[in-house]
């Protein structure tokens, strides 16, 4: 056994990469309370104070502090970088994306036009030399995609029935198992990949075999470059980490290699708390670490995650507002044996929100079960109430599918750590698809014949029997063009923007999932309900085109625990997912879908016309799986019950639900509020629901923040939105108004 593995137990993980087995053999669960936690050290306060000042400067400059224009980002493109002059000794975790804090790298491999536009948007002049290289000599992902797009694909993209496609930015959602760097050292990982290369292709050299051999070689090169990057900071990561500080640093170098080479829409950290706790506990036993020092290590690691930045273009920022990176980091959960996997370090990660205040990043995610230790549930609820910075996902529905060593690879999507990768698929606008079923495929905004020219509804009333066959046909068409478009995008991403650093830390024999998504979900449900249970009259313009709907009579709405509406919701999810499954998916990946919109529900709504449920043209779509605005009439619990009916097995990419609760609705004091929130989550997740964003504040606070963003208390005021967290002052005015328009529950 290597000297770095002293004190560790188990044998199965010694000779092959087996992170789960190592964790199961060595972690100590913790059932106690939060009284052991320590306040920030002097070094933490000083560094975080410097970063807060840099964030103020960044905001004053319009959202970007500094941007690279002359150097193409790579693992070794820069020398060592630190938070400030003379802070090297203060930083217990080192490493920056560039040479300066909050400076955004130049990443042209996804698309040179986008990289240059990101520069010019904020007043920076891109390099003429790099422009020549990436237009004449080096093809990019974006160029490859648009070279191969069919006219139909361009048409659906232009008309926004397929939205947010990863054809102008890195796809993200690939989580390298960064723990491997710490446990095994990079030399061991190189040797394992070299074995895979030797065993690949002993026979016919098919296209797939040739491509895989090239990819493994690229992964080996990435691992070697990872060592060079660490050496720039004075570290040798060839061998395993020797203590907790090294384990955290080694792991961070793995993550840093990813964010230096990719600008994916989600660059998740993964499930690291239990793993790191093993090293911290060993250091405690050896007498080389105190609790204050352990918390400082976690604080400094989280500080680095809070600093991750990418250069983005305006159209991207409209879709994903507030500068998110989805450095998603999970805590808690149960083992396959039913035992709690909560450790002291799970508390420590949540405690960073107290030591350094609220923050959108990392995207802290509690893998929730009603069987988690009471003290941990209470502490998580306490932090949610005070910071609105945590999301919760149901470990009891994910664990049977993904095991007990999975990560969240984006907003809410699970992936088995080190074993799987996901092809990100953005969203199909089913709300617009519904209007196409009525108009015969003609877009209400552009008047293009975007969808198939099926026979429109020609009468003055939308009848259920006339509408449903048309809607089914239109969804079938949309599912087909959606999958084909994504197949093309991911082929080109693999070819021109391959994630070698991340995939080097994932098994070569990787399982791939093919993510799709649904936008406008609740509006489609309520519109079908209106057509079925009420009378929907069509109002036409002078050309006879259906421009508006007038609904007579009442109809059940999703979000009120009414099975008449909720059954339609379940039907819609199952039907669309089954349509997706009919089609061939790239590299034999397994299709999934999500009900998730991010903040792009505002942009999607702009391009969507009037709907039978009463939603006006141009208004934001309801986010994720949330009920339509104004639909919830029976309180929070009824709304949660409706969402809980959606079957997770048909939406393995995730079902996002965001709720805002008035503090007074939870109770009159902290103890009551914590108890009530834990009770709500226990009941919600025991019903099989997948996800919950928890915001605890009143609308008055949002309005005051919008009107007075200069107040110090609002500098890091964080809220949960569909799939992530964001500083409220970083949203556009339009998006702020959208958040304010959503229901803040004043009662259960």
Predicted features by range, described:
Residues 2-748:
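Conserved catalytic cores of very large enzyme subunits
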């Amino acid at each position: 056994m290597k000297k770095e593995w002293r004190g560790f137990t188990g044998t199965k993980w010694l000779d092959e990469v087996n992170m789960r087995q190592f964790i199961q053999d060595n972690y100590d669960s913790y059932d106690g309370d939060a009284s052991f936690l320590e306040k920030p050290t002097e070094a933490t306060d000083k560094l975080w104070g410097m970063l807060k000042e840099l964030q103020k400067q960044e905001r004053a400059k319009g959202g970007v502090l500094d941007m690279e224009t002359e150097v193409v980002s790579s693992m070794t493109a820069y020398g060592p970088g630190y938070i400030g002059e003379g802070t090297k000794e203060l930083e217990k975790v080192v490493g920056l994306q560039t040479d300066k804090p909050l400076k955004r790298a130049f990443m042209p491999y996804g698309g040179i036009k986008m990289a240059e536009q990101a520069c010019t948007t904020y007043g920076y002049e891109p390099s003429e030399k790099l422009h020549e290289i990436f237009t004449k000599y080096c093809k990019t992902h974006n160029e490859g995609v648009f070279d191969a797009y069919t006219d139909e694909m361009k048409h659906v993209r232009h008309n926004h029935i397929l939205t947010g496609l990863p054809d102008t930015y890195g796809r993200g959602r690939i989580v390298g198992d960064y723990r491997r760097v710490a446990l095994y050292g990079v030399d061991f990982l190189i040797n394992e990949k070299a074995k895979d290369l030797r065993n690949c292709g002993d026979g016919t050299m098919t296209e797939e075999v040739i491509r895989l051999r090239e990819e493994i070689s690229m992964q080996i090169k990435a691992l070697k470059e990872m060592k060079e990057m660490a050496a720039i900071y004075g570290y040798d990561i060839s061998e395993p980490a020797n203590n907790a500080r090294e384990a955290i640093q080694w792991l961070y170098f793995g993550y840093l290699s990813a964010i230096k080479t990719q600008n994916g829409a989600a660059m998740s950290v993964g499930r690291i708390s239990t793993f790191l706790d093993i090293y911290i506990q060993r250091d405690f036993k050896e007498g080389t670490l105190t609790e204050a020092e352990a918390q400082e290590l976690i604080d400094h690691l989280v500080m680095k995650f809070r600093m991750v930045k990418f250069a983005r273009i305006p159209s991207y920022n409209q879709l994903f507002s507030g500068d998110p990176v989805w450095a998603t980091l999970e805590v808690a959960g149960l083992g396959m044996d039913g035992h709690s996997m909560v450790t002291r370090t799970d508390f420590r990660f949540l405690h960073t929100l107290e030591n350094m205040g609220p923050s959108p990043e990392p995207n802290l995610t509690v893998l929730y079960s009603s069987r988690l230790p009471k003290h941990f549930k209470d502490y998580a609820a306490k932090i949610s109430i005070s910071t609105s910075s945590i999301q919760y996902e149901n470990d009891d529905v994910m664990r049977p599918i993904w095991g007990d060593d999975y990560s969240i690879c984006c907003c809410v999507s699970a992936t088995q750590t080190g074993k799987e990768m996901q092809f990100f698929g953005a969203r199909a606008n089913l709300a617009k698809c519904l209007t196409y079923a009525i108009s015969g495929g003609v877009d209400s905004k552009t008047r293009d014949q975007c969808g198939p020219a099926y026979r429109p509804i020609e009468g003055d009333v939308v009848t259920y029997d006339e509408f449903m066959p048309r809607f089914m046909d239109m969804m079938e068409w949309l599912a087909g063009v959606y999958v084909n478009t994504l197949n093309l995008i991911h082929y080109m991403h693999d070819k021109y923007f391959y994630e070698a650093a991340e995939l080097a830390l994932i098994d070569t024999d990787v399982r791939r999932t093919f993510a799709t998504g649904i936008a406008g979900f609740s509006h489609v449900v309520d519109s079908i309900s209106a057509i079925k249970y009420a009378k929907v009259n069509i109002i036409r313009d002078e050309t006879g085109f259906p421009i508006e709907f007038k609904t007579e009579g009442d109809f059940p709405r999703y979000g009120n625990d009414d099975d008449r509406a909720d059954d339609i919701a379940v039907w819609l999810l199952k039907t669309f997912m089954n349509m997706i499954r009919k089609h061939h998916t790239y590299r034999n990946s397994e299709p999934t879908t999500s009900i998730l919109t991010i903040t792009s529900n505002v942009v999607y709504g702009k391009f969507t016309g009037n709907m039978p449920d009463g939603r006006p043209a141009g208004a934001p779509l309801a986010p994720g799986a949330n009920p339509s605005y104004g639909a919830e009439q029976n309180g929070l619990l009824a709304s949660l019950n409706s969402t809980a009916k959606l079957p997770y097995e048909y939406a393995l990419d995730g079902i996002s639900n965001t709720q805002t609760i008035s503090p007074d609705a939870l109770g009159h004091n902290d103890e009551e509020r914590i108890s009530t929130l834990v009770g709500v989550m226990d009941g919600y997740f025991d019903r099989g629901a997948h996800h919950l964003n928890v915001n605890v504040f009143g609308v008055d606070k949002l309005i005051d923040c919008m009107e007075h963003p200069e107040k110090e208390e609002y500098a890091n005021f964080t809220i949960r939105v569909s799939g992530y967290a964001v500083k409220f002052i970083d949203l556009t005015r339009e998006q702020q108004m959208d958040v304010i328009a959503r229901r803040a529950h004043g009662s259960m």
